[in-house]
């Protein structure tokens, strides 16, 4: 297995943000652009764990695929992923950047995580077991784990700092944060993106149970930013093995989450080391996601 990229170091560029997975660099002389670099770091429960070799390239490949497929719904921040077209300051790092980076427009990120759910799973399922009113949605009684909702639902959350937890908020609270008109626009865009992607993925044998979009503003216009519909930001299930009433076979981080849940770990840093077997099997799930969805 190839060596993983856990950290980045590009002295001629200016690191402006290091997230759970991505590092964002400003480029001297190009104030309207940023370089987004996907490392191989992997996180769960808002804790950075370790690295999955090649993961950053998988996330980048999928994001580029979805940016293209969804471009007629909303513009996105991508300028190019061809390292030969990057500004000159990036040239010394071309080999490190190839396949895992995107030159993007600098935007003002909206302070909302745009989550769309087509199926009941994960934390939403756990909350439903306690109360059928979840995130402001009154759901019918008697739903099973992994059941499909009649229509996709939009459940926003706050955007927490690294190490903190995102907090689910009501649509009304979101309206207070961004304004009524903008909130309606964000929800409409998010659901349209999910519906298009879910319909496409189903033709490839993949169910997108839920996903998280990030939106930003540039010149007063809302655009799609960050990563899009990857195994880090989504739940991907095998359509041919879908069976409501239980958790599903997936091509995402759920295998890793399940492993961590089996440990005596309080889900706070420091994270336990990941055995090689867990790293290899997680990588295999990510590989299958990109192969099924893109055909490559």
Swiss-Prot record:
Signal peptide: none annotated. GO terms for biological process: 'de novo' IMP biosynthetic process. Its EC number is 6.3.2.6. Keywords: ATP-binding, Ligase, Nucleotide-binding, Purine biosynthesis. The keyword Lyase does not apply. GO terms for molecular function: ATP binding; phosphoribosylaminoimidazolesuccinocarboxamide synthase activity. Pathway: Purine metabolism; IMP biosynthesis via de novo pathway; 5-amino-1-(5-phospho-D-ribosyl)imidazole-4-carboxamide from 5-amino-1-(5-phospho-D-ribosyl)imidazole-4-carboxylate: step 1/2. It comes from the Bacteria. GO terms for cellular component: cytoplasm. CDD domains: SAICAR_synt_Sc. The keyword ATP-binding applies. Pfam families: SAICAR_synt. PANTHER family: PHOSPHORIBOSYLAMINOIMIDAZOLE-SUCCINOCARBOXAMIDE SYNTHASE (PTHR43700:SF1). Belongs to the SAICAR synthetase family. This is Phosphoribosylaminoimidazole-succinocarboxamide synthase.
């Amino acid at each position: 297995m190839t060596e993983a990229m856990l950290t980045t170091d590009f002295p001629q560029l200016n690191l402006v943000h290091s997230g759970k997975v991505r590092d964002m660099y400003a480029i001297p002389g190009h104030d309207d652009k940023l370089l987004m670099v996907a490392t191989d770091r992997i996180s769960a429960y808002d804790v950075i764990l370790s690295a999955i070799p090649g993961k950053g390239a998988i996330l980048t490949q999928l994001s580029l695929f979805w940016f293209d497929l969804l471009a007629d719904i909303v513009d996105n921040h991508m300028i190019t992923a061809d390292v030969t077209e990057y500004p000159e300051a990036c040239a010394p790092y071309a080999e490190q950047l190839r396949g895992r980076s995107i030159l993007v427009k600098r935007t003002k990120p909206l302070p909302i995580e745009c989550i769309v759910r087509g199926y009941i799973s994960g934390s939403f399922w756990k909350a439903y077991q306690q109360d059928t009113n979840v995130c402001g949605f009154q759901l019918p009684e008697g739903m099973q784990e992994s059941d499909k909702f009649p229509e996709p639902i939009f459940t926003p959350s706050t955007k927490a700092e690294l190490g903190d937890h995102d907090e689910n908020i009501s649509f009304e609270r979101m309206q207070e944060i961004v304004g009524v008109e903008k909130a309606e626009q964000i929800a409409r865009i998010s659901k349209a993106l999910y519906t298009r992607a879910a319909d496409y993925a189903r033709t490839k044998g993949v169910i997108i149970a839920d996903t998280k979009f990030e939106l930003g503003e540039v010149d007063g216009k809302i655009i799609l930013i960050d990563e899009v519909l990857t195994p880090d930001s989504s739940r991907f299930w095998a359509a041919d093995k879908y069976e409501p009433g239980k958790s599903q076979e997936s091509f995402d981080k759920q295998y890793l989450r399940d492993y961590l849940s089996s440990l005596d770990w309080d889900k706070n840093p420091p994270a336990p080391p990941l055995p090689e077997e867990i790293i290899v099997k997680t990588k295999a799930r990510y590989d299958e996601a990109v192969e099924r969805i893109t055909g490559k």
